[in-house]
Amino acid sequence: MCCLCLSVYYAVPRCPILTNERRRRILFFGPSLFKWSITYIFPVKMRVSLQYVLFCSLSISSAEAEAKAPLKHLAPETCPWNPTIHKLRPPACASPDFIRRLVLPPSSSSSSWSGPEHCVNGTCVFSHAAQNGGIALITSPQHAEIIQEYAVEVDGGAHPPPFYAEEIEKKGIGLRASRPIVKGEVLMVRAPTLVTQVEAFAELEVGVRDMMYDIAIARLPKNRRDAFLTQMGRDVHDKINTNSFQFFVHGAGEKGIGHLGCYPDVAKMNHDCRPNVHYRITNATITTIASRDIQRGEELTVSYVDVFLPSKERKERIRTWGFECACALCQGPKNETVASDKRLRRIAQLKADLNNFKEMKVTAETGVEYTALHEEEGLHAHLGSAYTRAALNFALFGDEKRSREYALRAAEELSLEKGPESGDAWAMRGLAEDPGAHWTWGKRREVQK
């Protein structure tokens, strides 16, 4: 089958009775047939090698069809039409060095980054076999440079890990605590195995996108590649969609560009609408922290959806991942679910009132109710923002004692949620130190007068 495909690609550009338009139509539909045949017949390494052959065969055939004279190497910004990137923006062209790196295995040592490789529309593959056990990127060169600076060695979290993996009923593989875990304990610190720019994930033509996935995965060491491929999902695209965590890469003078990071160890944690583990991503590194005390044998969970959504919406979003939510809240008595939704509506209303500075809809005690509802609802990973609003509200009413008390609570929770050096944590420490000097001091008390 593959020999036939390659023969067609070699012969079509040379056929004197075909117009250029007919050549292009034949070559356009060929990649899908070739992609299907090698995807279901050959393993990853052989598949990538065959895709290299296809890519080079197409480049050579297209060039010979366009001109009888020897083709000169073009500048990196220009390139002749190529059927593998049909209907996409103009690609970055292949220089002689690019072709050499594309066809041959990376010649660089394992102590340095390889790439850019296989660039399409400014999106390229980068990899490092030794960095944090192996990492691959599918992104632009400028964002790859930033991420490469991010990817420092990490300590891995608690040693030995206070959890183990096992099959959990109705959920598949999950993690359970092997000993009691205290609130705030760092469980895992992991660098990503694969990082994909959101734009490349969503906008590249499927055949080109999947080829870049295969090349990136093939660049990983076997243990990292196996860990990625054993995640839930039909194919690489589905595994990224199901198991990745989004973060933003900030270049100079630009808004954050969304990227999807795959962390196979962290992805083993199942969903719960009231999770006991919180995570934060800093410079592409994910840190997981116990958001409350966890008993031995208890499952470790994170939330895959916005925990402030009503139960019906949470369940609908969970179904998009191909499973039903099996958490205690969603599977519990209906009256408890109804009560939970009522608390969530009240939380949303109080938040709006606390943020409303045009109308006096709150009292000094509103913040107390707001934080109490978070605690009752089990929103442990969001107590920092709740205490922050309460502390600011007390400051607005000129209540020094309780403003300081809630600011200290907020700083403690925010240190867990966002990190001890986060701007929000420092802001609350500043409020606790001198409430009277804060810009909010007494503002609502003045309005009351």
Give the ranges of each region predicted by the language model.
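Catalytic cores of histone-lysine modification enzymes
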Residues: 185-274, 320, 326-329
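Cysteine-centered motifs
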Residues: 2-5, 15
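C-terminal SET catalytic tail plus cysteine-rich post-SET Zn-binding segment of SAM-dependent SET-domain
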Residues: 260-405, 412, 426-429
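Secreted/processed peptides and extracellular or luminal domains of membrane proteins
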Residues: 9, 85, 99, 125, ...
